[in-house]
Curated annotation (Swiss-Prot):
The keyword ATP-binding does not apply. Glycans are attached at N42, N66, N74. Residues 1-29 form the signal peptide. Residues 30-157 are extracellular. The modification Phosphothreonine is found at T204. Changing C55A: Loss of disulfide linkage with alpha subunit. No effect on localization to the plasma membrane. Loss of localization to node of Ranvier. It is found in: Cell membrane; Cell projection, Axon. The gene is Scn2b. The lineage of its organism: Eukaryota, Metazoa, Chordata, Craniata, Vertebrata. Residues 180-215 are cytoplasmic. Residues 32-154 form the Ig-like C2-type domain. This is Sodium channel regulatory subunit beta-2. It comes from Rattus norvegicus (Rat).
Length: 215
């Protein structure tokens, strides 16, 4: 077959390229990483971590960030911090001066710190990120749980005792199996030796009888 026979026509190539570029998105979506639930002690300071992965360098002129708060999943969102060329703290009445930006957009970190956490701060915190030319806006959601006291540590003594008992039992079983195996092996070796000895004695007796008959 001639080489030109299987080459695509120019018109077909242009059509195929047009279709290809129409299907390929102009930007790639980012991934936002946040903890699903964050439990903190009442009156303490806590960091609400929010980081993202992007294939593009952060351009502060195009990059944008919104932090919002919700009392419940069906409640309306209240914006309390944003980034437009610079950090803008909206200082909502519920937070006052207790919110502080502790991230670095250039390092793909847009975390915030909430100081002197109160019971009323419990709820949902949303982190919205836009980093053109990424087409899709990134979103992270954190549920903040405020505790009145530190939960008691789990007593691991029982688990340790059970683990030690099971481990000891298994060790004994393994030891017994090894002893039984050794005893069986010794018996088998002894039987093999006895059989071989009997066979040799039989051969010796046979040779002796043959010599007597010849005489």
């Amino acid at each position: 077959m001639h080489r030109d026979a299987w080459l695509p026509r120019p018109a077909f190539s242009l059509t195929g390229l047009s279709l290809f570029f129409s299907l390929v998105p102009s930007g790639r979506s980012m991934e936002v990483t946040v903890p699903t639930t964050l439990s903190v002690l009442n009156g303490s300071d806590t960091r609400l971590p929010c980081t993202f992965n992007s294939c593009y360098t952060v351009n502060h002129k195009q990059f944008s960030l919104n932090w919002t708060y919700q009392e419940c999943s069906n409640c309306s969102e209240e914006m309390f911090l944003q980034f437009r060329m610079k950090i803008i703290n909206l200082k909502l009445e519920r937070f006052g001066d207790r919110v502080e930006f502790s991230g670095n957009p250039s390092k793909y970190d847009v975390s915030v710190t909430l100081k002197n956490v109160q019971l009323e701060d419990e709820g949902i915190y949303n982190c919205y990120i836009t980093n053109p030319p990424d087409r899709h806006r990134g979103h992270g959601k954190i549920y903040l749980q405020v505790l009145l006291e530190v939960p008691p540590e789990r007593d691991s003594t029982v688990a340790v005792i059970v683990g030690a008992s099971v481990g000891g039992f298994l060790a004994v079983v393994i030891l017994v199996l090894m002893v039984v195996k050794c005893v069986r092996r010794k018996k088998e070796q002894k039987l093999s030796t006895d059989d071989l000895k009997t066979e040799e004695e039989g051969k010796t007796d046979g040779e002796g009888n043959a010599e007597d008959g010849a005489k």
